[in-house]
UniProtKB/Swiss-Prot annotation:
It comes from the Eukaryota. This is Probable aldehyde oxidase gad-3. Disruption phenotype: RNAi-mediated knockdown reduces both the longevity-extending effects and generation of reactive oxygen species when exposed to 1 microM N1-methylnicotinamide. It holds the Pfam family Fer2_2. Its cofactor is [2Fe-2S] cluster; FAD; Mo-molybdopterin. It comes from Caenorhabditis elegans. GO terms for molecular function: 2 iron, 2 sulfur cluster binding; aldehyde oxidase activity; FAD binding; iron ion binding; oxidoreductase activity.
Amino acid sequence: MPLTGIFFNVNGKDVNEENVDPELTLAYYLRNKLGLRGTKLGCEEGVCGSCTVVLGTWDDCQNKAVYRAVNACLVPLFHVHKTFVITVEGVGSRDKIHPIQDRMARGHALQCGFCSPGFVMSAYALFSNQPNPTIQQINAAIRANLCRCTGYRPILEALYSFSSESGGCCGGNKTGGGCCKDKSSSDEDGGYDEKLLSFNDFPKYDPTQEIIFPPSLRVFSDSETPVTLKGDRIELLLPKNIDQFKKFKKDRTVISSGLITRFVSTRNPKEFSQKWISTKYVKEFNEITVNKDSVVVGAALNIQKMADTLTSSLSINIGKEIDSFIQKFSSPQIANFATWTGAIISGAKSSLSVSDLLILFNVLDAKLTLLNNSGELTQVAIEEFAEKKLFATHTIVNAIFSRSLTGFLFCLKLGETSEQDSTNFNFAALVGNQVSRIFVGLGGQPKRLTSLEVHIDALKGLSVSDLCQTTEMSDYKNVKIALTRFSDFMNHKEKTEEIEGINYLQYFKPKTNESAGRPIANYFNERAITGEAFYVNDIQAYNAVHLGFVLSTVPHAEITKIDVSEALQLEGVAGYFGVSDVPGNNTPGLQISNMNFPDDTTIFADKKVESVGQVIGVIAANDVVLARRAAKLVKVEYKELPSLVNFKEAIEAKSLLGDVQHFGKDENLVKESLENSSKVLEGECDIGGQEHYYLETQSSLVIPGEGDELIVNCSTQGTSFTQLMVAETMKIPAHKIIVKTKRLGGGFGGKVNNASWIACMCAIVAKKLNRPTYGFLSRADDLAITGKRHEVHAKYRVGINFDGKIEGIHYQAWLNGGWSKDHSEGVTMVMGLMVDDVYNMGTIRFDGYPVKTNSNSNTALRGYGNPQSKLINEGVMRRIARDVGKSTEEIKRINFALEGGRRYLGGKIHNDALVECWEYCKKWSEFENRQSGIKQFNKNSTAVKRGIAMSSVRFGLPHPGPTGHGIASLLINLDGSVQLSIGGTEMGQGLNQKMLQVCSEALKRPIDTITIVDCSTDKVTNAPETGGSQNADTNGLAVLACCKKIMSRLQPIIDKNDGEWEKSIREAYGAYVPLQCTEYGTVERAKFGVGEMESPYNTTGACAVEMEIDTLTGYNRVIRVDIVMDVGESLNPALDIGQIEGAFIQGYGLVTCEKITFNKTTGQLDQNTAGKYKIPKASDVPKDFRVKLLGINNANGAQVYSSKGIGEPPLMMSCGAVHSSIMNCIDNWRNENGIHEFVDTISPLSAEKIQELCSKK
């Protein structure tokens, strides 16, 4: 009789689970059954790495445990039978922190902390197998872990400190000179001799102290009896040997290892009953045999095991290319778990996509052993398997590779990005004395290029055009790339890449303060890195329901019918809720415009939909998987209406969300200024949108209380705004609603309006059902529902003199607002207010048009219109430079608006170090010398080009108006401990840590005697949204005001008690001295001689960026970055440098790999999954990354300990410099090839766009 259970171990504790649902993932089991919530859910697609855990198995051949990192969000629980599961909680805790966690926590290697457990686990898997890893091994281990906050540098630096290679963070430093940070730079840099951290002081890593492999798993005697697992929809059989498999497979509708099959099945909402059989535990399918002549790899083995076997068993020149190919093909987490068989079958089934492994298996002339339905074994060539679709009637048992293969293997994979991406085209060639095989993949099945193989010997003598003609392939562009690279390979077979030196530098001026100004690690780092930090979806509520979101599938239509009957039939579904269930206002954003811009977004669609992804209603169910399934069963019928999805068509149709906004001079005055100029230039710019890609998706938990009370736990950037939104929606006074935010897993502007809508939906359901209600968006739903950065189309006409000095400019900008207002009018306004950037442009006019389209309603995103203005102006400056024959940097410099001068709307420029930053950066980066070197490089390089560019930023702080204030509440307990609460939310920017340091400095109390509690409306209310880079400034002023008031009461008592704090507090209590207070913080502009609409001070900076592009593939890489910023006297240099680096990488992504497009016909977002939207990876971090804080103290009294805000300014600078640097690369190629037409700002400069611009038409 079959068994019904599985046995495994989690963090040292044995677990027996009976009748596991085959559809249950390891992540949901760990989080919801075992309460191990350090395993985060960021995408549930195996893309982001936040859910990474480690699986250990005992290898009898090696007599040791082998560990591998996997995506717990994909792994079915039944796959962990006889496995040691290790989560971040099992690695270490705050009481006994692991060295990996310790170095990352104290090394400032996290910001919001949501992705951090995943990085720890990826590193832990590597170190468990290789205690002395190389830098290349570390890079490979974390290459599929995504981080949106840090810019990766501190993560890499912390992990590189474990490297066995000399040089630590400078691994690859072949001089033996040690770490760049151990060298004092005081001689050349005048006092910038501090380093954020030296890992030399940390304890050495001791692998013998790791948790041991559980003896229970080693001695466990697994029965030969097959296991049967019965879930709600699936009965799964797990046979143990091939005879059992043959016996039972006839009765099973699905044959699979179970990984991808489970992933696909859970996305099928229908009720069904299926019988599966898994190859996972079939002995013969898990065997590896290495003979003298062949290598046999079992069908149930994972991709990495297959690759490792081939790498070690085939000739070195073939093996090393297989290893390199697999790293580009897949993430470690996927390769460590997905079977090579699944990849082969998926490729063989597809008539459209390109299969990487099929290409590899074809070029290696692999043979497959197949099992037919009669139980007979047969052997076929891989080509025959794919061509005859034998997967429909046969099961793969193993693959056989000949060990007699000789020569060199060459593989090329082309996608949107250079690694771990879907493939558009691939090419593989095996070239040797005996065997020459070449295959190409371009949609559908691999094609053998036999006609090209006969030309191998003559490769050096044939031109690429000649070779292309022999391929009989229509895709000339990709074939040309492949053959060019192949030709290079043939001529340099023995060449190996040198490890590049790594140069990470962070300079700041140290301060002698006890707290403020010191690079102290964020107090919550240890909590996050050990999995102990809770985010909204980690909070556990009794008897809760979860929401599944019913979304529009058409861009514009009337809703004629909503049928929820099939969804409500599912057991565990509590109900459907839509617009008729809203007790108050369905458009609450129109009623609370005093805290935000008026927003006509509906909570639920009312009679019509205006975008794909608009929320029509929600399903409430007992668990989130069921809720999402049920939501997909809701049938919505539409009467479709004309739609405007395409942005340019909407502009032509004059479809607007609001009034046209005009700033600057009268149109006639600008026209006159241009007519009087020596020359007028004009151009057009197109700037794409950007997704926030916070790792924690939108999350809310609303708990109903007595009466009308609601406790709203929400991942929001504005607790008071969310409170008012919920109050207006629920028709409940705000004082009965408490909104609490502990921390956000990233925000970037995307968790203001968006977060509040989700909270309102949860509140409606919680009140109706009187049950706690979770609203936790899947990544796909988050991408579909929420807004992005505004796409912009702009035109300009600029008048200049013969030197390139701007005398007047007229901007027109159209912003894609989407289907509702959201923040579109605000972003348009900020573009208009700040369009002069860092320049004095004479007579200026800006006309802004917020455009309505039937697409996502776009919203705030880091920079809030400023990055778009920056990119427009980069194009303007390049255009002028080209026309007058000067460098773009010269044109920028002569057009700077200087301190003491005025912005174009009349505000005076106060406390500004723009020129100092620019000149320092130019010298520090050796800009002019490197320009000469790049010129020589480009002269000698045909396809690969380099460029260098500088950009700068000026960002006025704090902002004028009601948003430019902070609020804080301070109370002192009788034991002397201090509790602080502020109106700003912590979302990775280090706001809470800075406020602790400010409070510590002001009270002269040790920082560990102060705690900062949740941002909550019952402690501080009416607080502005957190954003705009000003919250340390404004909330810092509020904290100082609280401390000043408290100390004015306490100081006489403290003096009387000779400074004894605890005794003084008790005495003050007895004397009825108030030990708590709440204060606002704002800059009294008149007091400092600053106008009401002027900025009291400016955060400024400059950067130089050197880029490289491959004009054939379109791929780019950052060679070196030099950033110089003035943030006054930094409150915490580590946090500020972290913000600078993170903003730089986010800005790099904006102008390179991050793309937002919509299907013109269906209105659907093309990048509608985590895998389709590309954010920068750790491999994109420049190897030479230098940041310097000037530390200029010209404080005017309006600053908190002479500091200035940070957050957004580096992003504007980054996107400008990266874009211009790439354009310099492109211009060089175009000039060399006789193409002289000017290319205005186009963003993003994706691989496809670079290829397009670097091609002869």
